[in-house]
A protein has these predicted regions:
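Membrane-interface helix-loop junctions and terminal tails of multi-pass membrane proteins
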Residues: 1-121
Length: 121
């Protein structure tokens, strides 16, 4: 809404930008998977690099996926409230949040398999 105010737009809008294709859903799955896998891997291996790896993953998701990497349900809902190029139509939200949840779960499971915990509890 701050950006809307700066440009003299209505503070809350409903986006008309449909993002409902299967390809965009797959792109959102991939973007979320890569982001969460990057976070989990970096924190596990060397958390000093988190400030570099997370923005790199987000940038890659933006440039190299069909969804432009929302990768977060809160961002998805927020972007439904702008009719700018970055918006998402309200009817597309369910697909994106489902893809984000699936991507996050897949990244968590894969990282757990790749780097098993060796707890002796």
């Amino acid at each position: 809404t701050l950006a809307h105010a700066m440009f003299g737009l209505a503070l809350v809008q409903a986006s008309a930008h449909a993002r409902s294709s299967v390809g965009e859903g797959i792109g959102e799955f991939v973007a979320t998977f890569v982001l969460l896998f990057t976070i989990l891997g970096t924190v596990r291996r060397n958390s000093e690099f988190t400030a570099l790896t997370v923005p790199a993953a987000i940038t890659a998701g933006y440039w190299f996926t069909s969804s432009t990497s929302f990768a977060n349900p809160a961002i998805t809902v927020a972007r439904s409230l702008t009719d700018s190029f970055s918006g998402i139509a309200p009817e597309s939200i369910v697909l994106f949040i489902a893809a984000q949840c699936a991507g996050a779960l897949a990244a968590w499971l894969f990282s757990g398999w790749l780097w098993p915990s060796h707890s002796k509890d």
